[in-house]
Amino acid sequence: MAIEARQAAEQVMRALNGAGFEAYLVGGCVRDLVLGREPKDYDVTTSARPEQVIPLFEKTVSTGASFGVVTVVLDGVNTEVATYRSDGNYADGRHPDIVFYSDTAEQDVSRRDFTINGLLMSYRGSSSVLSEAAPGSPAQASSFTVSPTPDGAIVVDYVGGLDDIRNKNIRCIGNPTHRFTEDALRMLRACRFAAQLGFGVSMETSLAIDRNAALIRKVSVERITAELLRIVSSPHADLGLALLASTGLLDYLPIRDAVKPSLANAMRRLSTFPTTDQDLGMAMLIAGADPCETDNGHLCKEVLKLSSEHSSAIAGALEVRMGLLVNGPFYHDPESHSRFRLKRLMRTPGAMNGVALARQDVLLRREEEGGGGEAELAKQYRERAARQYLDVFDYCMSLTPGDIRPERLVTGDDLIAMGMEPGRGFRIILDAVEDLQLEGRVATRGEALEAAGKMREAVEASTGSGPNPCGEAVPEKG
């Protein structure tokens, strides 16, 4: 039977303890456990050197040998095991030039970024913490807190992280300027933790971000974008964005020009409609950018360096949002025979997120205009218009892949069988018949063939555009 990630990590710790070494859970997993959250992964820190860790387990991978990191594999579950260490200078603003192994857990946690990430935890059911005789044990440390957990584990705190968690406070370990000089991305991580946890940032840490904000330009765009995606998909994204603005960090980010003018609207949108979908969150962030001045596809792919898939999904969502807001009443009118256009629009990458964005716009506008002092007739008109939009959005959300891309009832072979020569007329007829199908005006192959036959003569006589069975001219589609 497969074991859980925490069980695997605790088996690793027990094995290390049994061999005479100290071993603890460390970092974000301890923070999350203290907060009652489920960690995504579990990291172990130990007094054992990599060459002492490897013989204790059947399967290991040296994932970061130069940093003292070994991955232990138990029943298919990976646990990263890192030797206690202290870091040298960070010449590249990301990695230490040299790593020194340490003898104590206290030295190891003192190099980490924030106090909430500097906690240690023993395995469940353990009856003691560090050996009294071990160098750097709590008994010999100058300042520490030992706190039992309800499930029998013990939290060891050398940095005041437990108090900061209780006070919902993000604070650097040691001198914040030193921490940010080592790795400037830590400034953005502070904003991300504020967004994820709903915490505030200590005055000293906030002022250090303000003083050192320009250092973020040393960080690769890809790393910056990864943090931004985490911020906008967090429960308190508005807090993270507010911190970006108040510390001046936003002024040095590649997305500044697109989002700064409408940041307040983005914060309101993300506060009202929080999401865990990173593509939707990013679309919500840049939804307020001037469409006349912003190429969303270029912004995502070239400025933020997102993948083609994510760029298409985000830019597509914004395109669908605009299409729905501009044409909502038209799509709502059954006499307009426009459902085929709506279904084609819903083929756009990220379309469902586009519907969510448009719905947000309507609901936020309705909330803004819902104050007093409005004539009853105007209020009724506004509410009726909003209801039309919302009906269209509900319809879009109800569409299945088969509704949006039904199997074609007529093919090019059918047109050849009718005596047509392959050419641009094929595309016109095939698309026009599919439009009828999307509109629900043909449902069988026989009806589709009959419609194609009626179009044939008109299309062949035309110079490139023929009659649209839905009532409009059919443009040539390239």
Show which residues each predicted segment covers:
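Catalytic cores of the polymerase beta-like nucleotidyltransferase superfamily
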Residues: 1-478
